[in-house]
Amino acid sequence: MASGKEIKTKIASVQSTQKITKAMEMVATSKMRKTQDRMAASRPYSETIRNVISHVSKASIGYKHPFLVEREVKKVGMLVISTDRGMCGGLNINLFKTVLNEIKKWKEQGITVEVGVIGSKGIAFFRSLGLKIRAQHSGMGDNPSVEELLGIANDMFDAYKDGKIDALYLAHNQFINTMSQKPSFAQLVPLPELDTDNLGERQQAWDYIYEPDPKMLLDSLLTRYLESQVYQSVVDNLASEQAARMVAMKAATDNAGNLINDLQLVYNKARQASITNELNEIVAGAAAI
């Protein structure tokens, strides 16, 4: 059995770690709430611009933007959004498993795959697999902006426009609630058809004169919309990261508490055994006299 001093040292070490994990839990909670506010603030913009795109595309008879045209898929691009830091449970691993399953399905159909990766964890993972990384970005911090994402987003959009890929998919972690985050995998371009049932009456009752012409407006709106989708996915993934880290750090803090209790019990037993031995020695000495 370890000595009382050794056990005390272990208890102090675990208590120090517990303070760190508790602080990380509190920081993650605060960051998660701020990120949720950014998610809520950006969503109305994205939804409104998507509805305008639907209306303009219907008004632009005879013109189809490349981002709206389906074509035979021989090459696929994927934009994967991961985290820059760890200590967030199985968040990244679950996302990577989903992505690898999709890649496997495409390769079985003879479709080649290229990836663009946001986040250092994803970059390291896909490099280790030897996959071709078309574009990458990391070091975003806790408050990413649309501007810093334009480089990698436009790289992937240009690859689609130039015919280097025939479809682009977006993979990230979707924030459900504090205890639940799930991998999300969706087609980004060609833009999926929008359900406009609830806009039908408005579109029949109203018509618009577009300045400049609908073609120029549609070109601009589609680019802005796709950029906003990438930004929203990054913010969604960031909220998922902070929630997962909060849960992981809470579990670590609780486990540290349990370990401290166990070590304290071992220490008490060791101390009791030491006192018993000393009493036995005193009694034995008295009997010898």
UniProtKB/Swiss-Prot annotation:
Membrane topology: Peripheral membrane protein
GO biological process: proton motive force-driven plasma membrane ATP synthesis
Pfam families linked to this entry: ATP-synt
InterPro entries according to UniProt: ATP_synth_F1_ATPase_gsu (IPR035968), ATP_synth_F1_gsu (IPR000131), ATP_synth_F1_gsu_CS (IPR023632)
Main location: membrane
Keyword Iron-sulfur in record: no
A GO term for molecular function: ATP binding
Keywords: ATP synthesis, Cell inner membrane, Cell membrane, CF(1), Hydrogen ion transport, Ion transport, Membrane, Transport
Any one GO cellular component localisation term in the record: proton-transporting ATP synthase complex
Subcellular localization: Cell inner membrane
Function: Produces ATP from ADP in the presence of a proton gradient across the membrane. The gamma chain is believed to be important in regulating ATPase activity and the flow of protons through the CF(0) complex.
PANTHER family for this protein: ATP SYNTHASE GAMMA CHAIN, ATP SYNTHASE SUBUNIT GAMMA, MITOCHONDRIAL
UniProt similarity note: Belongs to the ATPase gamma chain family.
Subunit organization: F-type ATPases have 2 components, CF(1) - the catalytic core - and CF(0) - the membrane proton channel. CF(1) has five subunits: alpha(3), beta(3), gamma(1), delta(1), epsilon(1). CF(0) has three main subunits: a, b and c.
The name this protein goes by in its record: ATP synthase gamma chain
Gene that produces this protein: atpG
